[in-house]
């Protein structure tokens, strides 16, 4: 194994991609590798509060990340600076040893799923309502509702939560069901290891004999030809045997680069649904649910402050809440809006960029093409109105966080499929139409000046 300090830096680099910036900077950034004793990696935490939090929340993630990098199974032990002697430490109960892939039971125990990610703990809002409904339908009737179910959206918006929730629901209602959740990176790494060890049949048996396959971040298969080939056959086997497949990505299938057309086509067989960033009301609801689950007593004004400042994704939002609570505990002061501002000053930009709304887009597009605002919501189909309306829908999809149904509502209650059609049409035209490119550029420049 490589030098433990180099290894720890690599581990931190991988974990930084998986968790929110506030969580990483609060809990992991200041940690250091201390030593490796047998199969236990000892990590220095800055204080006892951080040590206990890391042990209860991050041991499993760290162990899995180390295994992904090295193929080694290590126990994780956190210590604090005044107590760095390794002679007398005891293993923490939460530091589990992870078995190697082909020593794992083919029963795929429920422990593979995060117990906190259930439908009950999922906060429904306008940006995720359709994805939640589709996920619940799949969980209630695997391989009968939508197969595959393809969920896409930005980092930290709840895709993984829904996938785990599906797994929990299926197991709860059918304890004998074989449910497996994994990332595409883990699928790739296990496939490589199986080829290296000349055990491809073990790998295939493992993933082609399940009832529900939940595979996260499928975009990372892009460019990996052999792995795509293997997943193609895994997909076919499961689909032909009426087994449920749920896939997540940060973008829709058609936008994943270097993805084989035959895979792209299969991903589009079922239902494709997106998740967009939560609106203010949903962000506040998420904070309330998180605070209740963790036993935090947070004043409403503090939750409102955090929700107003963090609007990117749920992971960042919850990470900010944890950072505020940690800061309050460490300096032994009551949680207030002022304390929250102090705790979050390093992660909140001093000036936030203006949020562009659908109304902004309609106004600027209307001025550009000399059409009235009410025309965007009217039923007129003349080209002089319909084409600018499609451009406005396209820009609403590109420049706002609004869901497809929300965009449709703002254009006279049109169906979300109309928005999809408009976006696809303008996207295609932009590839060859220089005049349209000029229009879009001019409109975007005007929007930036608002």
From Swiss-Prot:
Main location: cytoplasm
CDD domains from the UniProt entry: AAA, Bac_DnaA_C
Region annotation (Domain IV, binds dsDNA) ranges: 329-450
One GO cellular component term noted in the UniProt record for this chain: plasma membrane
Alphabetical GO biological process terms: DNA replication initiation; regulation of DNA replication
Disulfide bonds: none
Chain residue ranges for the region called Domain I, interacts with DnaA modulators: 1-79
InterPro entries: AAA+_ATPase, Chromosome_initiator_DnaA, Chromosome_initiator_DnaA-like, Chromosome_initiator_DnaA_CS, DnaA_C, DnaA_dom, DnaA_N_dom, DnaA_N_sf
Region (Domain III, AAA+ region): 112-328
Keyword terms: ATP-binding, Cytoplasm, DNA replication, DNA-binding, Lipid-binding, Nucleotide-binding
Record field: transmembrane: none
Domain of life: Bacteria
Subcellular localization(s) per the UniProt record: Cytoplasm
Molecular-function GO terms, alphabetical: ATP binding; ATP hydrolysis activity; DNA replication origin binding; lipid binding
Amino-acid positions noted as binding ATP in the UniProt annotation, renumbered to this chain: 156, 158-160
Region (Domain II): 79-111
Assembly with partners or alone: Oligomerizes as a right-handed, spiral filament on DNA at oriC.
Domain statement: Domain I is involved in oligomerization and binding regulators, domain II is flexibile and of varying length in different bacteria, domain III forms the AAA+ region, while domain IV binds dsDNA.
Function, in words: Plays an essential role in the initiation and regulation of chromosomal replication. ATP-DnaA binds to the origin of replication (oriC) to initiate formation of the DNA replication initiation complex once per cell cycle. Binds the DnaA box (a 9 base pair repeat at the origin) and separates the double-stranded (ds)DNA. Forms a right-handed helical filament on oriC DNA; dsDNA binds to the exterior of the filament while single-stranded (ss)DNA is stabiized in the filament's interior.
Family statement drawn from the similarity comment of this UniProt entry: Belongs to the DnaA family.
Name of the molecule in the record: Chromosomal replication initiator protein DnaA
Origin species: Geobacillus sp. (strain WCH70)
């Amino acid at each position: 194994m490589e030098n433990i300090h180099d290894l720890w830096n690599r581990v931190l680099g991988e974990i930084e991609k998986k968790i929110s910036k506030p969580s990483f900077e609060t809990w992991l950034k200041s940690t250091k590798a201390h030593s490796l004793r047998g199969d236990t990696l000892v990590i220095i935490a800055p204080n006892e509060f951080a040590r206990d939090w890391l042990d209860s929340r991050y041991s499993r993630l760290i162990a899995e990340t180390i295994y992904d990098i090295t193929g080694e199974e290590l126990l994780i032990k956190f210590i604090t600076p005044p107590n760095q002697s390794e002679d007398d430490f005891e293993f923490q109960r939460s530091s589990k040893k992870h078995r190697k892939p082909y020593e794992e039971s083919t029963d795929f125990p429920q422990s593979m799923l995060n117990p906190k990610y259930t439908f009950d703990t999922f906060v429904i809002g306008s940006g995720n309502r359709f994805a939640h409904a589709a996920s619940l339908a799949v969980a209630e009737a695997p391989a009968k509702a939508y197969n595959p179910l393809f969920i896409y959206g930005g980092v930290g918006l709840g895709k993984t939560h829904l996938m785990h929730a599906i797994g929990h629901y299926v197991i709860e209602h059918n304890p004998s069901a074989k449910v497996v959740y994994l990332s595409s990176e883990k699928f790739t790494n296990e496939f490589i290891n199986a080829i290296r060890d000349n055990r491809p049949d073990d790998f295939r048996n493992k993933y082609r004999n399940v009832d529900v396959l939940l595979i996260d971040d499928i975009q990372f298969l892009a460019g990996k030809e052999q792995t795509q080939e293997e997943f193609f056959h895994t997909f076919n086997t499961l689909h032909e045997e009426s087994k449920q497949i749920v896939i997540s990505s940060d973008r829709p299938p058609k936008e994943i680069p270097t993805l084989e057309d035959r895979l792209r086509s299969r991903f589009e067989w079922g239902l494709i649904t997106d998740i967009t960033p939560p609106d203010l009301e949903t962000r506040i609801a998420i904070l309330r649910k998180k605070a209740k689950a963790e036993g935090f007593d947070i004043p409403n004004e503090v939750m409102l402050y955090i929700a107003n400042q963090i609007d990117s994704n749920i992971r960042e939002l919850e990470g900010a809440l944890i950072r505020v609570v940690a800061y309050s505990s460490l300096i032994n002061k009551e949680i207030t809006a002022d304390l929250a501002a102090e705790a979050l000053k390093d992660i909140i930009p001093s000036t936030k960029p203006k949020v562009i709304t659908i109304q902004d887009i309609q106004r600027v597009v209307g001025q550009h093409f000399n059409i009235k605002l009410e025309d965007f919501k009217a039923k007129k189909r003349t080209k002089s109105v319909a084409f600018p309306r499609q451009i406005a829908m396209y820009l609403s999809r590109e420049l706002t966080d609004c869901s497809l149904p929300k965009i449709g509502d703002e254009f006279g209650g049109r169906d979300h499929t109309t928005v999809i059609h408009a976006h696809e049409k303008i996207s295609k035209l932009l590839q060859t139409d220089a005049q349209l490119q000029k229009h879009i550029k001019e409109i975007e420049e005007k929007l930036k000046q608002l």
